């Protein structure tokens, strides 16, 4: 059964909230230097070196797109998991690794 727009937004919003919460914890515990800007369908993280990770919801496709300084990635919801369309990697471990590589911040979910 196809996912509805409402279901998509709920799943995506839950992930955005988990990322924001983990970053807030990292800021408190690691004195991490990262700015979070959540606006509409976009969650933008800016690091001390000026680089950014942009995570956005693509409602028409029911995908989450992520842009890092290493490339762009598209995640679709498959069998209960957000998976990269190219390599099948899971979203949250990918985000953890990207934030560590790009910003030097270790997140715990």
Curated annotation (Swiss-Prot):
Q: Which Pfam families match?
A: Frataxin_Cyay (PF01491)
Q: Name one GO molecular function term.
A: ferrous iron binding
* BP GO terms, sorted: iron-sulfur cluster assembly
Question: What's in the keyword line of the UniProt record?
Answer: Iron, Metal-binding
Report which superkingdom the organism of origin falls in. Answer: Bacteria
Q: According to its record, what are the GO cellular component terms?
A: cytosol
Q: Show the InterPro entries listed in the entry.
A: CyaY, Frataxin/CyaY, Frataxin/CyaY_sf, Frataxin_CS
Q: Is Glycosyltransferase tagged as a keyword? A: no
Against Gene3D superfamilies, the record matches this protein to: Frataxin/CyaY
Output the HAMAP family linked to this UniProt entry: CyaY (MF_00142)
The UniProt entry's sequence similarity note says: Belongs to the frataxin family.
Q: What does this protein do?
A: Involved in iron-sulfur (Fe-S) cluster assembly. May act as a regulator of Fe-S biogenesis.
Question: Which NCBIfam families does UniProt cross-reference here?
Answer: FeS_CyaY
Protein's recorded name = Iron-sulfur cluster assembly protein CyaY
Q: Name the gene for this chain.
A: cyaY
